[in-house]
Amino acid sequence: MTKKSASSNNKVVATNRKARHNYTILDTYEAGIVLMGTEVKSLREGQASLADAFATVDDGEIWLRNVHIAEYHHGTWTNHAPRRNRKLLLHRKQIDNLIGKIRDGNLTLVPLSIYFTDGKVKVELALARGKQAHDKRQDLARRDAQREVIRELGRRAKGKI
């Protein structure tokens, strides 16, 4: 199973910053993506957005939807549609496992990032559960409390108390 996130030697093109705020991440997967040539060139220029992106299962295949990859500015009539659906490449066992988990629970597939690994475009895909408003408030309160603890420890280390 290829469970790894974008490491430091990979060039990250786009990240979904709201995903960790709106969802509880349960598991992550690395998936390949089927792209056209102008899409790869546009990604190399960093022209992508994962805002409002999600993945769905259709006929035993996983499709990435609502990802915006801008048209390649040097492209001609061969340019791609910016928000077309793109097929994700995973092993059959991984796809079957994801389908089972999605059907069993209230889970969804959310792309966390798009990056290059050895010249190939990869998507970090997360199996996630949506957060309610009270969950978001609890996370915010927990982060504030942690920040206060760190601030207090810094003051004590400097001898200001």
From Swiss-Prot:
It comes from Mycolicibacterium smegmatis (strain ATCC 700084 / mc(2)155). Keywords: Cytoplasm, RNA-binding. It is found in: Cytoplasm. PROSITE patterns: SSRP. Required for rescue of stalled ribosomes mediated by trans-translation. Binds to transfer-messenger RNA (tmRNA), required for stable association of tmRNA with ribosomes. tmRNA and SmpB together mimic tRNA shape, replacing the anticodon stem-loop with SmpB. tmRNA is encoded by the ssrA gene; the 2 termini fold to resemble tRNA(Ala) and it encodes a 'tag peptide', a short internal open reading frame. During trans-translation Ala-aminoacylated tmRNA acts like a tRNA, entering the A-site of stalled ribosomes, displacing the stalled mRNA. HAMAP family: SmpB (MF_00023). Belongs to the SmpB family. InterPro entries: SmpB, SsrA-bd_prot, SsrA-bd_prot_CS. One of its GO terms (cellular component) is cytosol. GO terms for molecular function: RNA binding. This is SsrA-binding protein. GO terms for biological process: trans-translation. It holds the Pfam family SmpB.
